[in-house]
Amino acid sequence: MVRILTERVIEGNDKYIEAAGLSTDSKPTENIVTGSVFLEVNTGKGFLFNETAGTWVEQ
């Protein structure tokens, strides 16, 4: 289960989030802005969201 640790509304429905979950969890993609952060707790991998591509990019 994905846990949203931080959520800030940027404009309208768009929001910046910092979230954590398992690598098998579906990462959120709707109304998320570039630079949002996701940590896979079971792998230790970190991801940043790319709003233009609509994908999470491993860092």
Task: Please describe what each predicted stretch is.
Residues E51-Q59:
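Tryptophan-rich substrate-binding surfaces of secreted polymer-degrading and adhesive proteins
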Residues M1-K45, T55:
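Extracellular/surface-exposed low-complexity repeats and stalk/linker segments enriched in Gly/Pro
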